[in-house]
A protein has these predicted regions:
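Core catalytic region of metal-dependent phosphoesterases/phosphodiesterases
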Residues: 5-11, 20-114
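Conserved beta-sheet core of the metallophosphoesterase superfamily
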Residues: 102, 107-108, 118-120, 125, ...
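Short glycine-/acidic-enriched loop or helix-start segments at secondary-structure transitions
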Residues: 53-55, 93-96, 131-132, 213-215, ...
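Nucleotide/phosphate-binding catalytic cleft detector across ATP-hydrolyzing
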Residues: 1
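Active-site neighborhood of phospho(di)ester-bond hydrolases with catalytic His/Asp-centered motifs
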Residues: 15-16, 42-46, 82-88, 121-122, ...
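Anionic group-transfer/hydrolysis microenvironments
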Residues: 18-19, 49, 125, 248
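Active-site-proximal loop/helix segment associated with metal-binding centers of metalloenzymes
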Residues: 122-187
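Binuclear metal-dependent phosphoesterase catalytic core
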Residues: 112-115, 215-290
């Protein structure tokens, strides 16, 4: 008999910046994540497919196809609703937006109605001047980022060999370069203003590959990060609460859920009683032989 796969259940899951088509992504971790979650709504908040990478030196791998199939399986088997929001790397979708078929909706922006609050959900590239006004610079930067990730992978292999923890070169660069830090702050402030204009209590976006969860002038700002480095998502629990969940935290929760599912407390108690009884019987037999 086939054992049913253990999954973590959520009301809504928000993913962004998976960049399928880039050579260096966390695709294996993403596939593991998708195969062990269940949700009513899955929001793909932009840059799900990296059209820029596929036009250049990118590569579509079998793991990327499996990712798409996992999502379609969620739609077919679990009746999950998928909302796919256009990003700047998959801007080819602009030609067909908006479009809805079956339980899949592809659009520019989306209003998520939580249990108590409303959130404006969009990729966020519309507030990035490099993406909107200097697109050619953004494309060059994308190529450089891909190459940096490739070098970072080999560098971390060396660090692992030396017994050291992985190191993110891009995160280090973002923290050190003052202009990059200021760019992130301006970006976040602009998004908060847009949320107010849409009469929303919060904003959920991606684009800048920096996971965040904070209040900006009364607006709940959330960024899901990415699946290139941070490997993180935003999950909405059944009670409506939202939190950022990175891959390591997800694996820990999944392990705890598996233990609770396959080895509940009652089973441990009954098993210990059986073991104790058998040990007592064996001890009595040994004593009788002596």
């Amino acid at each position: 008999m086939k054992t049913k796969k253990v999954k973590l259940e959520y009301r809504t899951v928000f993913l962004s910046d998976t960049h399928l088509g880039m050579r260096e992504t966390g695709i294996q971790k993403l596939n593991h994540f998708l195969s062990h979650i269940s949700c009513k709504t899955l929001v793909l908040n932009g840059d799900f497919i990296d059209g820029w990478a596929l036009e250049g030196s990118g590569q579509w791998k079998k793991a990327h196809t499996r990712c798409v199939r996992l999502i379609l399986k969620m739609v077919e088997k679990e009746k999950t609703r998928v909302v796919y929001l256009r990003g700047n790397h998959d801007d080819f979708l602009s030609k067909i937006l908006p479009i809805t078929f079956d339980r899949i909706k592809i659009c520019e922006k989306y209003i998520h109605k939580g249990k108590e609050k409303k959130y404006l959900v969009l990729h966020g590239d519309c507030f990035d001047s490099f993406s909107t006004k200097r697109r050619w610079i953004a494309r060059i930067g994308s190529i450089g980022y891909d190459n940096l990730m490739r070098f970072n992978r080999f560098y971390n292999k060396y660090r692992k060999f030396r017994g050291k923890r992985p190191f993110s070169l891009s995160a280090w660069a973002k923290a050190k370069v003052k202009s990059a830090v200021n760019h992130v702050h301006r970006y976040e402030d602009s998004l908060a203003d847009m949320a107010r204009k849409h009469n929303c209590d919060g904003m959920i976006c991606g684009h800048i590959h920096v996971a965040a969860d904070r209040i900006i002038e009364g607006i709940h700002y959330l960024n899901s990060g990415d699946w290139v480095e941070s490997n993180s998502a935003i999950v909405e629990e059944k009670d409506g609460s939202l939190e950022i969940l990175d891959y390591d935290q997800f694996c820990k929760k999944l392990d705890e859920h598996k233990k609770a599912t396959f080895y509940p407390r009652a089973n441990f108690t009954s098993a210990s009683k059986v073991v104790s009884k058998r040990r007592k019987t064996i001890t009595q037999k040994i004593d009788s032989l002596n």
